[in-house]
From Swiss-Prot:
Its main location: endoplasmic reticulum. Its EC number is 2.-.-.-. Residues 1-9, 479-488, 538-552, 597-599, 643-654, 706-728, 799-819, 871-878 are cytoplasmic. Keywords: Cell wall biogenesis/degradation, Endoplasmic reticulum, Glycoprotein, GPI-anchor biosynthesis, Membrane, Transferase, Transmembrane, Transmembrane helix. Pathway: Glycolipid biosynthesis; glycosylphosphatidylinositol-anchor biosynthesis. It comes from Candida glabrata (strain ATCC 2001 / BCRC 20586 / JCM 3761 / NBRC 0622 / NRRL Y-65 / CBS 138) (Yeast). The chain crosses the membrane at residues 10-30, 458-478, 489-509, 517-537, 553-573, 576-596, 600-620, 622-642, 655-675, 685-705, 729-749, 778-798, 820-840, 850-870, 879-899. The keyword Zinc does not apply. Coiled coil: none annotated. The keyword Endoplasmic reticulum applies. One of its GO terms (biological process) is cell wall organization. Glycans are attached at N90, N138, N198, N262, N286, N909. This is GPI ethanolamine phosphate transferase 1. GO terms for cellular component: endoplasmic reticulum membrane; fungal-type cell wall; fungal-type vacuole.
Length: 921
């Protein structure tokens, strides 16, 4: 019966955490996507016949315009002189501000569809998930696209007529991070050139290319690839920018010669930027600021300023005398639609940037009004959806003060006056139209979040219910040893059945998605069980805290609150975690451990471990640190084998020696790979094969050989696990991570011995406060759960895990295997901790899963904290941090649920024996 209860807890816990992990995307980041709108044409008099959209994937704004010293030639110059000359003489320019996640799919969707996908869109992939809403390409006469197979199929396969979009793509094998990235962009220009040449012998193709309303999309992946491989301050990245600039210059001349009409509009921009460490995804300004340069038919020339405008970011651009016009990334879709006179994309929320448009105020006003009405149409459709799903509907307050009809009436009255000669009213009409757009966009957000309060209440009761339910199971199984099933009373069944029916009807009436019903199931289940077991909770709490005075209870309570709050703040400021670790350095003394060597070694290890949360989580490759860590792992393992030689058989000694040899071998192959890649000589085949061979042998064959003749000494088992994962951690380390692995393991080993000593001390004193030790171990274990991540990672950037280490195994871009390797690196410290907690159960002579069950019951206090700390407004860096915090908090709980099972299997039949272990094992 006890096993059934444990199994139920684990299954329910895994399902609960997986589902509630997604709840923030259903509540805070739901897509305002609606269908059934009447589309609005941008203008009846398009200024351009065709448009070229040139996207430098991963190109930063500052790199485009700054004067930069090339790391090889040492020459200081502008990397893009032609684009710069356009800014100075022919173009309007600015910064296009992207939103998070700063990834390729959301960035391209924003600029081409004018629509910000919800944050979860980054998980959809690319080719397999074409965009499921209207786009600028969908509205063109025909689109010719060239570039990456990760981007082009989204819009080709997602078009209303796939034949409307042609795509020329290279194979995935081109995306080799160890080769020149320029070839990726050369492919694009080469195939565009071939298209023009083919048209000279194909009249039908020539006619199609020359028709009005066409778009040409050039996706240039080179900068992104070079940035990931060598960083955005590398010669490779700079050379790629130089190459793009030269090719754009050739392209402009080629287009002018081919069409010969000067009716082509050009847009040059990027989908996202690149961090200093070669990553993107988060809301750091280096990732969200991209260049936007627009020139050609229908586009303004530069506006020169009498008084130069300076700011810290652009001061080195030397463009202070030219007006900079910043836009939101979605505004680009509206601009492109206007330039060739297509409909605004149905779901576009982009605002037409008037500063970029050449033309009269009247023409601008017409296009802007159509833009506003297109967005207003989305609001009306969304409002009808909400009205039809509410018992009572409260109109958006700003539209209650002044309705959309009143706005439109006022604008159209101004237009009539303008047509009658009162041209001075044009700025007022434009201002009012822009105000209507702004209020409409705010109204869309209001409608999208209309049911927030109700569903957030359900989720809150779900978290509180899980905390109480899991703590109740802990008390029942491990404190009271009560495995009997308590059946709910008729009153309990009646109350929760009635409540469930009422809440389900509300969800049904509101036309809620299926997930909302699933969110409701959990709080109903949890609280039904809690109210059926109030006696167990009361008796369990009394037993758990037996022998603890009121004063001690207050001190313990304040300590727990302080640690939990410290952990919450530690998610934002990692140095706080270092302070907590240093404070833990003295707890053995407080608990009565007097051995000087034990205390000194523990203090040194605590200080050493605390240093990792002071280091920059975004790392620069450092082979020396990897080598030092590898040597320490080899020496510590050899020392451990010598110390345990009396307790292990020759068979086990040989296996452990082989594992130490594998660690040395992995260190050798890692060193060869790093040196070769740093010299730009590519990944040596022997190092790649050797790395994979040791990785597979360490993780599969060696554990199997140990399984054939297992040694049940807990120290030997922990050493075996330590050596099993060491090669993986070495090859996946960028700098100090392997050092963390060494010290983190040492910390766990010492912690086990200290708690064992404290238990012996308390048993000698016949102390009746085992609950305090259990609570202390659970709190430290929970804290180490956070250190398992923060020792090498950081939630200030969801992209803080650089791909440098993965190139040593996978030089060609392949997101899923690369992601799997990074996840392996992330999970390994959790596995070590889970094994440590399992051994702690044995050391303290308590039942399996006792400590992890107590940790699981309290860990979601963090999840609930971060659920309410989530931000949907403000800087994208802040928003990204809050999302990452919540995900990490809830995944930590999920990891403990899953990994305690893994840990239990890894520690099967382990005993406390250290000297009685027979060598025949």
């Amino acid at each position: 019966m006890k096993n059934n209860t444990r199994f139920t807890l684990i299954v329910v816990g895994v399902l609960f955490h997986l589902l509630y992990l997604w709840s923030i995307f259903d509540i805070y980041f739901i897509s305002p996507l609606v269908h059934g709108m009447e589309q609005k044409i941008s203008t009846n008099n398009p200024p351009a016949k065709r448009l070229f959209l040139i996207v430098g994937d991963g190109l930063r704004a500052d790199t485009t315009f700054d004067k930069i010293t090339h790391p090889v030639t040492k020459k200081a110059d502008y990397l893009a002189p032609f684009i710069r000359s356009l800014v100075q003489n022919n173009a309007t320019y600015g910064i296009s501000h992207t939103r998070m996640p700063t990834e390729s799919r959301p960035g391209h969707v924003a600029m081409i569809a004018g629509f910000y996908e919800d944050v979860s869109a980054v998980t959809k992939g690319w080719k397999e998930n074409p965009v499921d809403f209207d786009s600028f390409f969908n509205q063109t006469a025909h689109t010719y696209s060239f570039g990456s197979p990760d981007i082009l199929p989204m819009f080709k396969d997602g078009a209303s007529d796939p034949n409307k979009v042609d795509a020329w793509m290279y194979g995935h094998e081109y995306e080799d991070f160890t080769q020149s990235s320029i070839e990726l962009d050369a492919y694009v220009f080469r195939h565009l050139d071939q298209l023009f040449k083919n048209s000279s012998t194909d009249k039908e193709l020539d006619k199609q290319i020359r028709q009005d309303g066409n778009a040409f999309f050039l996706h240039l992946l080179g900068c992104d690839t070079a940035g990931h491989s060598y960083r955005p301050y590398s010669a490779e990245y700079y050379d790629n920018v130089i190459y793009i600039d030269k090719q754009v210059e050739k392209l402009v001349k080629q287009v002018e010669e081919f069409f010969g009409d000067n009716d082509t509009a050009f847009i040059f921009t990027a989908d996202h930027g690149m961090s200093a460490f070669g990553s993107h995804g988060d809301g750091h300004p280096n990732n969200t600021r991209t260049p936007l340069v627009a020139w050609g038919a229908g586009l303004n020339r530069p506006v020169r300023l009498d008084t130069p405008e300076f700011d810290e970011y652009t001061e080195n651009w030397n463009l202070a005398n030219i007006k900079r016009n910043d836009v939101k990334q979605a505004d680009i879709a509206a601009l492109m639609s206007y330039l060739i006179g297509t409909n605004y994309p149905a779901n576009s929320v982009g605002e037409l940037p008037l500063a970029y448009i050449e033309g009269s105020e009247g023409q601008k006003l017409e296009a802007l009004l159509n833009n506003a009405e297109s967005i207003l149409e989305q609001y009306r459709v969304k409002e009808n959806e909400v009205i039809n799903s509410q018992f009572v509907y409260k109109i958006y307050p700003k539209f209650a003060e002044k309705s959309p009809t009143e706005y439109l009436k006022e604008i159209k009255e101004l237009i009539k006056k303008i047509e009658n000669g009162e041209e001075s009213l044009e700025p007022e009409a434009i201002r009012l139209t822009e105000e209507l757009m702004k209020v409409t966009l705010e109204g869309l957000h209001y409608l999208t979040t209309y049911n927030w309060r109700f569903i957030r209440t359900i989720v809150t009761f779900g978290f509180l219910g899980w905390i109480c339910y899991s703590f109740m199971i802990f008390l029942k199984l491990f404190i009271l040893n009560n495995s009997q099933t308590t059946h709910p009373s008729i009153l309990n069944i009646s109350i929760f059945t009635s409540l469930g029916l009422i809440l389900n009807y509300i969800l049904f009436y509101q036309k809620s998605p299926l997930n909302f019903y699933l969110y409701l199931i959990f709080p109903l289940f949890f609280w039904s069980k809690i109210f059926s077991n109030t006696a167990i909770i009361r008796d369990g709490v009394n037993e758990f805290f037996k022998g603890i005075s009121k004063a001690e209870s207050v001190i313990i309570g304040l300590t727990i609150i302080s640690i939990y709050e410290g952990i919450v703040y530690g998610f934002f400021h990692r140095w706080i975690l270092s302070l907590i670790l240093v404070s833990f350095a003295f707890y053995p003394l407080v608990c009565g451990v007097t051995d000087l060597f034990t205390n000194l070694l523990w203090i040194l290890t605590s200080v050493g471990l605390s240093s990792f949360t002071l280091l920059d989580a975004v790392k620069i490759e450092n082979l020396q640190q990897i080598q030092v860590a590898g040597i320490l792992i080899v020496l510590s393992s050899a020392y451990a084998v010598m110390r345990l030689s009396q307790d292990i058989s020759k068979y086990t000694q040989h296996l452990l020696s082989i594992q130490i040899f594998l660690v040395s071998g992995m260190l050798h192959f890692t060193s060869k790979s790093v040196i070769s890649l740093q010299k730009r000589e590519g990944l040596p085949a022997f190092a790649q094969v050797g790395g994979w061979a040791i990785l597979v042998i360490s993780l599969t064959i060696m554990p199997f050989l140990h399984y054939l003749k297992p040694n049940n000494n807990y120290q030997v088992r922990l050493l075996t696990i330590y050596l099993t994962f060491a090669p993986s951690f070495i090859i996946l380390s960028i700098s100090f991570e392997a050092l963390f692995y060494f010290i983190f393991t040492a910390y766990i080993v010492q912690w086990l011995q200290i708690e064992k000593n404290i238990k012996v001390l308390k048993d000698e004193q016949k102390s009746d406060s085992n609950g305090i030790q259990l609570l202390r171990v659970a709190i430290i274990g929970f804290f180490l759960q956070q250190i398992a991540f923060f020792g090498t990672g950081n939630v200030a950037s969801i992209s803080s895990f650089s791909l440098d280490s993965v190139y040593r195994l996978l030089p060609v871009f392949d997101p899923f295997p690369m992601g799997a390797l990074l996840m392996l690196k992330l999970i390994i410290p959790y596995v070590l901790l889970s094994c440590g907690l399992g051994i702690m159960n044995i050391q303290l002579d308590i039942k399996d899963y006792t400590i992890s069950s107590l940790i699981i019951s309290t860990s979601d206090i963090l999840s609930l904290n971060f659920f309410y700390l989530l931000k949907t407004e403000g800087s994208w860096l802040d928003i990204g941090v809050t999302i990452s915090n919540y995900c990490l908090a809830i995944l930590s709980s999920l990891f403990m649920l899953i990994l305690e099972i893994v840990g239990h299997q890894l520690l099967k039949n382990v005993t406390r024996a250290t000297s009685s272990q027979k060598k025949t094992n």
